[in-house]
Design a protein with these regions (language model features):
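Signature of soluble extracytoplasmic/periplasmic domains of secreted precursors
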Residues: 1-386
Length: 386
């Protein structure tokens, strides 16, 4: 009855917002979700699987870490397996039979980000694009997939290699490596691909993967892979000593999907969004000028802002935090922050949405035919070391 009467308008929503000195948090529940919800595809992927608190290989040095639950029995995941088998028959009909209940993607702390930040600060988006083009092989980004069957994982990797070498012979070189008695594989370009990359000035690039009985890690950064292997060794050591594993330093807010982002990547986002936000704020600020000029020039109201407020019960505010003042030379109102179209000003402090935050956490949980979303923004407190 609810869906037939109200589905075109809204879902039933309950929300709680908490604001204190250290953080802002929101907890939103939507129950039930309508049948044609935009979240339906995500729900079909995660199914009834719930994330374990320590799933995803959580670790302190991650700058951003995203994780999602996987229901390998769901129609979506079954279709993914069938598509893989269609394109690469050697993988078999049950290509992803080794996959467990989650996958995650993370980026770790690295000098790469400091260099990237300098390129962004110097040349903005163009600098970022050029830097990524030249240094993609150093990108400290990794993919983790939980493995439940090491034998099926081994068969999958062997079939994948055979398919690659059959479809693109001589284009890749596969070599086995070892780190602290832990094996991993390096896939490097060869032949024409290698020559083309060298001609374009791209530094060495390779793909690395390390399988284990419980996890498959794939990355472009060998150092990142070694860190992952170190964590595996530490976990095995604790297990042998019958000691508990360390708790997730950045707990997942959702049991179906979660993401956590720290201050360094937040600052990058701020840089990329700053120009666009400033343009939007300037445009909104200038949108108020025509009516103020109308009151001033045609109706003779010396305090056009006060007249507008009294007449329409709406206070016109400059989104940049400035004031509206009369410019006698140009015969127009202007913002003390953005100026006016005939004499624009550059804000001393560009618009910044997330500048005051050191970490952002967000999570989704699908339960009881509905959705629960949690989000927390951790503030950067004065005199705080981090």
């Amino acid at each position: 009855r609810y869906q037939s009467n109200w589905s075109a308008f809204f879902d039933p929503i309950a929300a709680r917002l908490v604001i204190d000195e250290g953080h802002l948090s929101a907890d939103v529940s939507i129950m039930p979700l309508i049948a044609n919800s935009d979240y339906r595809q995500i729900i079909e992927t995660t199914g009834t699987v719930k994330l374990d608190p320590n799933a995803g290989d959580p670790h302190e040095e991650s700058l951003v870490h995203w994780i999602t639950a996987l229901d390998m029995k769901s129609r979506t995941m079954q279709q993914a397996g069938n598509m893989a088998a269609l394109f690469a028959p050697s993988l078999g009909l049950n290509a992803f039979g080794w996959v467990g209940q989650w996958m995650s993607v993370y980026a770790d702390e690295s000098p790469f980000w400091d260099e990237f930040g300098k390129a962004v600060a110097k040349d903005g988006e163009d600098g970022a694009e050029e830097f990524m083009k030249d240094n993609v092989g150093r990108l400290p980004l990794a993919l983790n997939v939980e493995a439940t069957n090491p034998f099926k994982l081994t068969a999958f990797l062997a079939a994948l290699r055979a398919w690659v070498e059959q479809t693109a012979p001589g284009m890749t070189t596969w070599t086995n490596h070892e780190y602290k008695k832990q094996g991993y594989v390096k896939i490097a370009p060869a032949g024409d691909i290698l020559e083309d990359l060298e001609d374009e000035g791209v530094e060495e690039i390779a793909l690395y993967y390390a399988p284990s009985s419980k996890l498959l890690t794939v990355t472009l950064n060998e150092e990142l892979l070694k860190r992952s292997l170190d964590r595996r060794l530490e976990a095995r050591k604790l297990k042998r000593e019958k000691k508990p594993l360390p708790k997730n330093p950045k707990p997942w807010l959702g049991k179906s999907a979660s993401i956590t982002v720290n201050s360094k990547l937040i600052s990058f986002f701020d840089v990329f969004s700053r120009d666009e936000m400033t343009k939007q704020f300037r445009r909104r600020s200038w949108n108020n000028l025509p009516i103020l000029n109308e009151w001033k020039l045609n109706l003779g109201k010396d305090d056009a802002l006060a007249y507008h407020t009294k007449t329409w019960h709406v206070l016109l505010i400059c989104p940049g935090g400035g004031e509206y003042v009369w410019n006698e030379k140009f015969q127009t109102y202007e913002s003390t922050v953005f100026g006016h179209p005939g004499g624009p000003k550059t804000p001393k402090n560009p618009a910044s949405l997330l500048k005051g935050f050191k970490r952002l956490d967000f999570g989704l949980t699908f339960e009881h035919d509905g959705l629960r979303a949690k989000g927390t923004a951790w503030k950067r407190l004065p005199n705080a070391s981090n």
